[in-house]
Amino acid sequence: TEGYGAAYALNPKYQEELSKLLNANLVFVEYRYFLESTPEPKNWDYLTAENSAYDLHNVRNTFKQIYPEKWISTGISKGGQTTMLYRAFFPDDVDFSVPYVGPLCKGVEDGRHEPFLRKVGTKAEREKIQDFQLEVLKRKSDMLPLLESYCKNKNLTFRIPMPEVLDYCVLEYSFALW
């Protein structure tokens, strides 16, 4: 289950961790209202957790005829949320649910992330991470060409300027690491 757009899964070299480990087939489902799954006209009334669960239920029922063995639902971030919601609405559809990350936010400002980041790991590890982040920001003018070159070589594109991409990478590093 993908929580966002699924275009990257079209890459012939793409492999998802569980399907690789289990030598399993992969049915990759793009979340409604993202990329190619955006209807015209956009009627936001249909963008609900229940409808997304029904989407997965219908996909699973269709493919279960072809793939009758065990089923796993997995996802990261919004995909993790989708995995949990799918299990909540259709508890018997899949044999296993593996939400790698599934943040269920309490509101626009959740408040749980900061205390987590202040306690995770050891104090020395947290200090090393913060020192690294500060060092990268101090050397931003040197780091930016390296990031631009890397992104160009990997054909990565963004909707924001590259200096902002670097800022996000640095500021989100501790959260992404843990």
Regions found by a protein language model. Name each.
Residues T1-N51:
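N-terminal cap/lid subdomain of alpha/beta-hydrolase-fold enzymes
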Residues E2-G5, Y33, S77-K78, V101-L104:
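Short, flexible loop/turn elements at secondary-structure junctions
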Residues L22-L26, P68-K70, D92-D95:
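Loop/turn elements at helix/coil->beta-strand transitions in domains of secreted/extracellular proteins
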Residues F28, S73-T74, F96-P99:
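A structural signal for short, well-ordered beta-strand segments and their strand-loop junctions
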Residues D45-I66:
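Alpha/beta-hydrolase active-site loop
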Residues Y67-S77:
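Alpha/beta-hydrolase fold nucleophile elbow
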Residues G75-L85:
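Glycine-rich nucleophile elbow surrounding the catalytic serine of serine-hydrolase chemistry
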Residues L85-W178:
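Alpha/beta-hydrolase
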